[in-house]
UniProtKB/Swiss-Prot annotation:
This protein serves as an immunogenic antigen, inducing gamma-interferon responses in whole-blood cultures from M.tuberculosis-exposed adults in Uganda, The Gambia and South Africa, indicating this might be a good vaccine candidate. One of its GO terms (biological process) is nitrate assimilation. The lineage of its organism: Bacteria, Bacillati, Actinomycetota, Actinomycetes, Mycobacteriales. Increased nitrate reductase activity is seen under hypoxic conditions, however this seems to be due to induction of the probable nitrate/nitrite transporter narK2 rather than increased enzyme activity of the probable nitrate reductase NarGHJI. InterPro entries: MFS (IPR011701), MFS_dom (IPR020846), MFS_trans_sf (IPR036259), NO3_transporter (IPR044772). SUPFAM superfamilies: MFS general substrate transporter (SSF103473). Belongs to the major facilitator superfamily. Nitrate/nitrite porter (TC 2.A.1.8) family. It comes from Mycobacterium tuberculosis (strain ATCC 25618 / H37Rv). One of its GO terms (molecular function) is nitrate transmembrane transporter activity. Induction: A member of the dormancy regulon. Induced in response to reduced oxygen tension (hypoxia), low levels of nitric oxide (NO) and carbon monoxide (CO). It is hoped that this regulon will give insight into the latent, or dormant phase of infection. Induction by hypoxia is independent of nitrate and nitrate levels. The chain crosses the membrane at residues 8-28, 45-65, 72-92, 98-118, 131-151, 157-177, 205-225, 244-266, 274-294, 301-321, 333-353, 365-385. The keyword Transmembrane applies. This is Probable nitrate/nitrite transporter NarK2.
Length: 395
């Protein structure tokens, strides 16, 4: 289809910039905690707040994409994220924890971009290629890696508020380019039905809740680690904020690069098998992380491989969604599933902060909870989740 590659690439770039904006607080969390004398729980809440709003907002932006189209919604979310980015910069410059948490809520708007881009990418590709298209769009998660790597450095080079102004300018310029270049797929037809009934209809589909459960683990794990890993690394291994950001960027990049691999594999073998392998690997590697492997080589190998497992799983789950969700409900189902993924990323930082053992300096309890959850999901997928029948997968 003419224009599909260009539109997919541009939509992915829009996702990159919004994911960077969504993840602005996490890479600086250790600095905020030090400068504002925050407790572990307060720092965890600060990191988790944008994740919560980004998750819940996806329930709305998904069906709105069915109604107004991906082009309009990608532009709208990008523009709506500019002011919160600047407001967070002001609050950070003032050193106000309360304002940071408050404006961090609105920073979550940028995180809703995922529920917009998935149906947009779906509309441009045939069912047999949707694992690929959603995997490529999912590479927009690299924005978290860019944020983890560059945000602390930008603060050191340019200053705190200027860093936020740079991200706001990137959002604005991206929105302008999208207005000129981005187009909805020729086959897109707006769904004018009211949003609430469509959400209720999507909520009645078994695929919605099965995929929500699985995505809450694989994508939630990615989001949680991408935001909380700087705190984890500095606490456990004593690295500086910049060094922790670089290592977190490596984690996020590995997950991002693995996501299209998960989609590609799902186009060739059953997504169920891809997700099963992802969950089993996640459980094994989270257990290894709980043992606190030595810094550098062993810890890096553990977390990078964990990132690959999570990334492959995210690609596999959404390839599964693309096969099973009814065509008229893709946006609504995507919104709910994506929200579940975001919520899956909201609670782990809070749990990690609450279960941290300052005496032994470890997060063992939190990591073992991830092991148990991944094993439960793996067992459920093996025994109950099934591939779609042809009626579900038809478009």
């Amino acid at each position: 289809m003419r224009g599909q590659a260009a539109n997919l690439v541009l939509a992915t770039w829009i996702s990159v910039v919004n994911f960077w904006a969504w993840n602005l607080i996490g890479p600086l969390s250790t600095s905020y905690a030090r400068d504002m004398s925050l407790s572990s729980a307060e720092a965890s809440l600060l990191v988790a707040t944008p994740i919560l709003v980004g998750a819940l907002g996806r329930i709305v932006t998904g069906p709105l994409t069915d109604r107004f189209g991906g082009r309009a919604m990608l532009i709208a979310v990008t523009l709506a994220s500019i002011l919160p980015v600047l407001a967070v910069g002001v609050a950070a410059t003032m050193g106000s924890y309360a304002l940071l948490v408050f404006f961090g809520l609105f920073l979550g708007v940028a995180g809703t971009i995922f529920a917009v881009g998935i149906p947009f990418a779906n509309n441009w590709y045939q069912p047999a290629r949707r694992g690929f298209s959603t995997g490529v769009f999912g590479m927009g998660m690299v924005g978290t890696a860019l944020s983890a790597f560059f945000t602390p450095r930008f603060v050191r080079w340019f200053g705190l508020f200027t860093t936020h102004a740079i991200v706001a300018a990137a959002l604005a310029s991206t929105a302008v380019v999208a207005m000129v270049v981005l187009r909805d797929a020729p086959y897109f037809r707006p769904n004018a039905d009211p949003v609430l009934p469509r959400l209720k209809a999507a909520a009645r589909l078994p695929v919605t809740w099965e995929m929500s459960f699985l995505y809450a683990i694989v994508f939630g794990g990615f989001v949680a680690f991408s935001n909380y890993l700087p705190t984890y690394i500095t606490t456990i291994y004593g690295f500086s904020t910049v060094d922790a950001g670089a290592r977190t960027a490596g984690f996020a990049l590995a997950a991002v690069l693995a996501r299209p691999v998960g989609g590609w594999l799902s186009d060739r073998i059953a997504p169920r098998h891809v997700v099963l392998a992802s969950l089993a690997g996640t459980a094994l590697l989270a257990f290894a992380a709980a043992l606190q492997p030595p810094p550098e080589v062993w810890s890096a190998a553990t977390f990078i491989t964990l990132a690959v497992c999570l990334g492959v799983g995210t690609g596999g789950v959404f390839a599964w969604v693309a096969r099973r969700a009814p065509a008229a409900s893709v946006g609504s189902v995507t919104g709910i599933v994506a929200a579940a993924g975001g919520l899956g990323g909201y609670f782990p930082p809070l749990v990690m902060g609450a279960t941290y053992d300052p005496v032994d300096n470890d997060y063992t309890v939190g990591l073992l909870l991830l092991v148990a959850t991944a094993l439960v999901a793996c067992t459920y997928t093996a025994l109950h989740a099934r591939e779609p029948v042809s009626e579900e997968a038809s478009r």
